[in-house]
Amino acid sequence: MSFTPSPVHLSRRTLVAALCLAGLGLASHSAWAAKPKAKAADGPFDMEAFNNATDAPLLRSGSQGAAVARAQIMLDRAWFSCGEIDGRFAANMQRMVRAYQTAHDLKATGTVTAETWTSLRKDGAPLLTTYTVTEKDTAGPFEKTPVAMDERAKMKALVYESVDEALSEKFHCSPGYLKQLNRGSIESGKQITVPNVAASATPVSAASIEIDKSERVLYVLDTAQRLVAGFPISIGNEKNDPLPLGTMAIKNEVKNPGFTYNPALLKTAPKDAQKVDIAAGPNNPVGSIWLGLTKPHWGIHGTPNPSNVGHSETNGCIHMTNWDAERLSTLAKAGFKVNVKA
């Protein structure tokens, strides 16, 4: 893996890079793991009941349902992102529950206990809200992301594949969960139910980043080294391009970056692969934002595959969901220290 910014490309918001995504990016945008398709509810979703629920069940790995989704939304708003909000308690949520508990002086069990519910509910804002779909939302353009890099290089922009995907990212949830909340197709003018992630309050202080390779988590610390935010990440494969231990710093930020696939810099690239430039866009291999690091060719960036984050290995760099990478960029500026530990 290598990421070599070019002054000419940067002036056009383009980065020269080798592949920094899981599985060489040669799988289709939607192909990672076969998951059961979410089924729409038989009747309209009861947003009021969801928002007014006061139950505090013990949630642990394997739990599913509305209570899990409520906890995920509150964790997201507290800046301890589970990645996609989907109503399923998996590894990312367990890590973030533990991080949240540590940050709030609770026993770090990794399970949502009664004490954790009490702490999370201090937020008070409704967990779900309504959103009226705009003409801009549905106008696109939307286009299927090709499998092959040379085919991606022919696209003018690596855009979303559908309005469902675009709105899912906007509201930090999986497309399947968005379908659970809303019956029928999404059209301009339609009022839909979405996670109320806009109610998130920015941490008052942030000074450095710590990356825990074993946990696959990026932590944000304040000046007193207290934990104020956490995000799931995917990192480089230990055999091909492992994330190095030690201290780096954020060097620059590029919004809506382009990408150059350079197989000569990849250990696992097909022998017949060609170097190609790929246009910017949310489904670009490095997503919607790039935070360059002082170690040459390395960066923290978004991804076109949010469901993979925290679960897959990459060929280098630090992958986050697009929305989490964008949120991180509001906290982490040039000069921010990035400490990587095993």
Segments predicted by a language model, with ranges:
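N-terminal secretory signal peptides
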Residues: 1-10, 14-28
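Sec/Tat signal peptide C-region and signal peptidase I cleavage site
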Residues: 29-33
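Second-shell loop/turn segments in exported
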Residues: 56-64, 81-87, 106-107, 150-158, ...
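A short amphipathic alpha-helical interaction element
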Residues: 63-109
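Short alpha-helical segments in extracytoplasmic peptidoglycan/chitin-binding modules
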Residues: 71-75, 85-86, 96-101, 163-171, ...
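Extracellular LysM carbohydrate-binding repeats and other cell-envelope/extracellular binding modules
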Residues: 91-137, 179-208
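Gly/Pro-biased beta-strand-loop elements
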Residues: 198, 204-303
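Exported/periplasmic cell-wall-interacting domains
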Residues: 270-342
